[in-house]
Amino acid sequence: MIDLYYWTTPNGHKITMFLEETGLKYKIFPVNIGKGEQFEPEFLKVAPNNRIPAMVDHEPKGGTKPISIFESGAMLLYLAEKTGKFLPADLYGRYDAIQWTFWQMGGLGPMAGQNHHFRNYAQDKLQYAIDRYVNETNRLYGVLNKRLSDREFIAGDYSIADMACYPWVVPYKNQGQDIEQFPHVKRWLETIKLRPATERAYAKAKEVNPNYGQPAIRTEEERKILFGQTASVVR
């Protein structure tokens, strides 16, 4: 059994997508980041960076005691190795999938995240910051579109690379992107959306968070919790 500490964000969706694809048994422990539940001591034992998702696997492959893992990329890699699925076994295919997963972790995710912040949540509309992150997100969409121009999925068969990237492309409108400019990304997006496991994963989001799909920031308290963090919150 896997305990999944989860909230309805792109990084959270990555893990439910994988778990639904493989049928691994898991239990969701909601961590409402708008209420500050990511700072609870019990959660910090699993996720010292006070970010979701995180998980505890009570039956690790080859292990004798439970293992806890945080960071969505590390979690995807762990789950792929545990199940032997969604990560090629051969050297070249394996590192192709891994490098594109890291591309999302180091590029698409952070840039799209800052894009969301300055376009949608920042109280002061700083045009330089908006342009900077909208343009960089646009460049990254271009990289992905080129990659998908001659293949169905990012790294051969459907893999953790696709699961890592997909949730960050779903909200393309909030990122100021015109999906029609990226036809290969659009086709890829529509293909993954129709997978039964993807449908189940996103259905989980609506079950866990009744406000899913609405603006993430609804009160000043939520704004303070999400955007006012300093080293003082590390306990």
Regions found by a protein language model. Name each.
Residues 1-131, 135, 145, 219, ...:
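GST-like domain detector, emphasizing the conserved glutathione-binding G-site
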Residues 79, 92, 101-197, 203, ...:
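GST-like fold's C-terminal all-alpha helical module
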Residues 32, 160, 205-208:
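Short, solvent-exposed turn/loop segments enriched in Gly/Ser/Thr/Pro and often Arg
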Residues 19, 197-198:
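Short beta-strand edge/turn micro-motifs at domain boundaries
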Residues 36-37, 190, 209-211:
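Short secondary-structure boundary/hinge segments and terminal tails
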Residues 205-235:
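Acidic/histidine-enriched, glycine/proline-rich intrinsically disordered or flexible terminal extensions
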